Amino acid sequence: MAKTDKVTAVAEITEQFKDSTATVITEYRGLSVSALATLRRSLGASATYAVAKNTLVKRAAADAGVEGLDELFAGPTAIAFIKGEPVDAAKAIKTFAKDNKALIIKGGYMDGRALSVAEVERIADLESREVLLAKLAGAMKGNLNKAAGLFAAPASQVARLAAALQEKKAGEESAA
């Protein structure tokens, strides 16, 4: 690879690091080209799956301010640059790795810190953003109904107490 090509490649990878919300680093040793194409299709438009030389990726990561990943860049390495929600892409990679034992998840990077394999898998096990928002809305609605009941209870108790006192007074006046 010519020096100008390397400089261009490092610049492109640096931009991908900067533009992505998360990255997942994998080892693809033993995967066929068609299997890699299947993985790329399963990631969809929200992620780019790229194979690059480790030295270029290390340099690009340093240029992008991404730290703590150098030990992951050994052997045949491919990176999923995720733009948008990391859950769906991590889930697709985890599912693909389960079906294709040749793909090994090495780790990742999100929110300014390196992720272990277990953390990447935990992200993959999360439900999608829409499902989590729906659950949150349901919980909030239920809690609002409970809160409304709590706030209404003292007022209704005062009203019942006033009605009981009025009945008691009316009963005392009629008895006298």
From Swiss-Prot:
The Swiss-Prot or TrEMBL record annotates one GO molecular function as: large ribosomal subunit rRNA binding
Keywords, alphabetical: Ribonucleoprotein, Ribosomal protein, RNA-binding, rRNA-binding
One Pfam annotation, family name? Ribosomal_L10
Any GO BP annotation: translation
- InterPro entries (UniProt xref): Ribosomal_uL10, Ribosomal_uL10-like_sf, Ribosomal_uL10_bac, Ribosomal_uL10_bac_type, Ribosomal_uL10_CS_bac
Q: Could you state one GO cellular component term attached to this entry?
A: large ribosomal subunit
* UniProt entry tagged with the keyword Ribonucleoprotein: yes
Per its UniProt entry, which superkingdom is the organism in?
Bacteria
Q: How does it assemble?
A: Part of the ribosomal stalk of the 50S ribosomal subunit. The N-terminus interacts with L11 and the large rRNA to form the base of the stalk. The C-terminus forms an elongated spine to which L12 dimers bind in a sequential fashion forming a multimeric L10(L12)X complex.
Q: What does this protein do?
A: Forms part of the ribosomal stalk, playing a central role in the interaction of the ribosome with GTP-bound translation factors.
Similarity remark: Belongs to the universal ribosomal protein uL10 family.
The name this protein goes by in its record: Large ribosomal subunit protein uL10
Q: The organism's lineage?
A: Bacteria, Bacillati, Actinomycetota, Actinomycetes, Mycobacteriales
The gene that this protein is the product of is rplJ
